[in-house]
Swiss-Prot record:
Name listed for the protein in its UniProt record: UPF0337 protein RB10934
Pfam assignment, any one: CsbD
InterPro entries the UniProt entry points to: CsbD (IPR008462), UPF0337_stress_rsp (IPR050423), YjbJ (IPR026042), YjbJ_sf (IPR036629)
SUPFAM superfamilies: Hypothetical protein YjbJ
Protein family (similarity comment): Belongs to the UPF0337 (CsbD) family.
Coiled-coil intervals, chain numbering: none
Length: 68
């Protein structure tokens, strides 16, 4: 979670990376997230029909792989 402050601060630049990882997310979804980690977990969970812990795991992978 230590990178999340940086991710939140650079969300506009990182939205493209998020959309590459989760191609089903719309621009509206990503705007709604607005850099908020819990919101991203919720949107990923909703769009992909995942359990919360699986969505959380995917967001952690994004967090550790993003260039931030």
């Amino acid at each position: 979670m230590m990178n999340w402050d940086r991710i939140e601060g650079k969300w506009k630049q990182l939205k493209g990376q998020a959309q590459q990882q989760w191609g089903d997310l719309t621009d509206d979804d990503l705007d709604r997230v607005d850099g908020k980690r819990e919101e991203l977990v919720g949107v990923v969970q909703e769009r992909y029909g995942l359990a919360k812990d699986e969505a959380e795991k995917q967001v952690q992978q994004f967090e550790s792989s993003c260039n931030c």
